[in-house]
């Protein structure tokens, strides 16, 4: 069971041929912000998985995830407005950031696997008109950090160091290792 409203996470699981169902946890992410970025995404992933695990009475394994971009020590979730997205991109263009995704898998027998995966992202040096055109697509408003690697935002990324799928919202290599553990 995927405890996430993210279409990108669903697509990753579908493309990897991992059977799943979706149940959105309803965890209010906006009320939880008093942690550093790594602890924040881990806390939210665990909260999402825990809520859904309880709702389905532990009948299926539950995967919760949450992602943020850390840029210059600041946490960037989804930008609220086009103005905010544009302002962030002005800062991010030509610079490195860290995309953190917290993962939590709760098995039917109550075993908890929990880990945060971090991928370093180098954003392309962009002109004001490139930023304006990208923000006008609306895509930056849908994603943590204000970009979708699997969409037009992929054109705005120069280089990645770490897990590619993590930047989309879910580390498939981590999930594969975990599925091997819980299926032993």
UniProtKB/Swiss-Prot annotation:
Record's catalysed reaction(s): a ribonucleoside 5'-triphosphate + H2O = a ribonucleoside 5'-phosphate + diphosphate + H(+); a 2'-deoxyribonucleoside 5'-triphosphate + H2O = a 2'-deoxyribonucleoside 5'-phosphate + diphosphate + H(+)
Protein's cellular compartments: Cytoplasm
EC number: 3.6.1.9
Active site per database record: 66
GO MF annotations, alphabetized: nucleoside triphosphate diphosphatase activity
Gene Ontology terms: biological process: nucleotide metabolic process
Cofactor: a divalent metal cation
A cellular-component GO term for this protein: cytoplasm
Record's keyword annotation contains Cytoplasm: yes
Broad EC category: hydrolase
CDD domains found in the cross-reference section: Maf
Keywords for the protein's UniProt record, in alphabetical order: Cytoplasm, Hydrolase, Nucleotide metabolism
Nucleotide-binding in keyword set: no
Listed InterPro entries: ITPase-like_fam, Maf-like
Protein's job: Nucleoside triphosphate pyrophosphatase. May have a dual role in cell division arrest and in preventing the incorporation of modified nucleotides into cellular nucleic acids.
Family recorded in the similarity comment: Belongs to the Maf family.
Protein name: Nucleoside triphosphate pyrophosphatase
């Amino acid at each position: 069971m995927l405890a996430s409203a993210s279409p990108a996470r669903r697509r990753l699981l579908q493309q990897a041929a991992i059977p799943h169902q979706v149940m959105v946890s309803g965890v209010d992410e906006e009320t939880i912000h008093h942690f550093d970025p790594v602890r924040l995404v881990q806390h939210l992933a665990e909260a999402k998985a825990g809520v859904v695990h309880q709702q389905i009475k532990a009948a299926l394994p539950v995967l919760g995830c949450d992602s943020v971009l850390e840029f210059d020590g600041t946490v960037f979730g989804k930008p609220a407005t086009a103005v905010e997205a544009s302002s962030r991109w002005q800062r991010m263009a030509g610079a490195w950031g860290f995309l953190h995704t917290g993962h939590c898998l709760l098995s039917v027998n109550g075993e908890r696997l929990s880990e945060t995966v971090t991928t370093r992202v180098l954003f392309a040096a962009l002109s004001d008109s490139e930023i304006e055109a990208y923000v006008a697509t609306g895509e930056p408003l849908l994603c943590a950090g204000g970009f979708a690697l699997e969409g037009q935002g992929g054109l705005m990324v120069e280089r990645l160091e770490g897990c590619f799928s993590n930047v989309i919202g879910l580390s498939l290599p981590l999930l594969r290792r975990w599925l091997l553990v819980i299926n032993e």
